[in-house]
C-alpha cells in the first residue's frame, strides 16, 4: 500500500523532489538500492520475487515509480515492477512510453505509474484512456488515482508543503508518521476494515506486512540523488543506501 508525495517544478534548479514509502510483506525478498548488473542504466531497489522495481532513476535524469491500485488481482498478471525497470532501461520519452502502455495496461493488475525526465513528468492511471502530463505543483499518490483525498494523503501533502525542502531529516520524518484517522474517516476500497485500518497511516509498522523502505529523490541541475532507508518487521531500521546518477 505504497504512498508518495512530490514537488514538480521543471525549469528550476531542483525540478523534482519526491518522497515515497514502499509497503510490502516482510517475507518478500528484496535487494537494496543499487545499479543493476543486467540492466546497467537502472539504479533502483529490486523485488527479487518478480524481478522488477517500485522506484528508480537512470542517467539523463530519468525517473519512474509506481503504486498498486486497490482492486482484485488478476489471476496471472504480468509484473508491475517491470513497468519501472523497462522505462529506466530504455530511451523513450516518458509520454511516449506511457502512451504505449495504455494498450496493454489490462495485462497488469491495477497500477499508477509516474515516469519523467528533466523536462516532462507523466502519470498513467491503469484505467485511464490517456496518460496525463503533469503541470508544476505538489502532488500526492497512494493506491487510488492521483490526489485522491484519503486522510493520510491529505495530511502528508499538507505537511510536505510546509516542510523545508533542503532538510533531509525533516523530509524523512514526514514518512515516519504513524497517525491514523478515526474509523469513520477510513476509505472503503473493498479490502476489509482490518486492512483499511492497518494501512491508514503513512508509516505501517507491522510484523508481517509494513513499510519496507523510504526513498528520497532529488533531481538537480545535472544529476539525480536517490537515498533509500530500509526497515525490517515492526519498522525497525535496517540500513541506508544513497547514490548519485548523472
Task: Indicate residue ranges for each PLM-predicted region.
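N-terminal nucleophile
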Residues: 1-246
Amino acid at each position: 500500500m505504497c504512498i508518495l508525495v512530490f514537488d514538480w517544478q521543471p525549469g528550476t534548479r531542483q525540478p523534482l523532489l519526491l518522497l515515497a514509502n514502499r509497503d510490502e510483506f516482510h517475507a518478500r525478498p528484496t535487494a537494496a538500492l543499487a545499479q543493476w548488473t543486467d540492466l546497467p542504466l537502472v539504479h533502483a531497489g529490486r523485488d527479487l520475487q518478480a524481478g522488477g522495481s517500485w522506484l528508480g532513476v537512470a542517467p539523463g535524469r530519468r525517473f519512474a515509480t509506481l503504486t498498486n491500485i486497490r482492486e482484485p488481482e488478476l489471476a496471472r498478471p504480468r509484473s508491475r515492477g517491470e513497468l519501472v525497470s523497462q522505462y529506466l532501461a530504455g530511451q523513450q520519452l516518458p509520454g511516449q512510453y506511457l502512451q504505449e502502455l495504455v494498450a496493454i495496461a489490462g495485462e497488469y493488475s491495477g497500477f499508477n505509474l509516474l515516469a519523467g525526465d528533466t523536462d516532462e513528468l507523466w502519470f498513467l492511471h491503469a484505467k485511464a484512456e490517456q496518460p496525463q502530463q503533469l503541470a508544476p505543483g505538489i502532488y500526492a499518490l497512494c493506491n487510488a488515482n492521483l490526489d485522491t483525498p484519503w486522510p493520510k494523503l491529505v495530511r502528508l501533502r499538507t505537511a510536505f508543503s510546509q516542510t523545508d525542502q533542503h532538510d533531509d531529516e525533516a523530509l524523512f520524518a514526514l514518512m515516519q508518521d504513524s497517525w491514523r484517522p478515526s474509523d469513520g474517516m477510513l476509505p472503503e476500497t473493498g479490502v476489509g476494515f482490518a486492512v483499511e485500518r492497518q494501512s491508514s497511516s503513512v508509516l505501517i509498522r507491522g510484523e508481517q506486512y509494513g513499510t519496507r523502505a523510504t526513498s528520497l529523490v532529488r533531481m538537480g541541475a545535472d544529476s539525480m540523488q536517490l537515498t533509500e532507508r530500509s526497515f525490517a518487521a515492526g519498522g525497525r531500521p535496517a540500513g541506508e543506501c544513497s547514490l548519485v546518477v548523472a
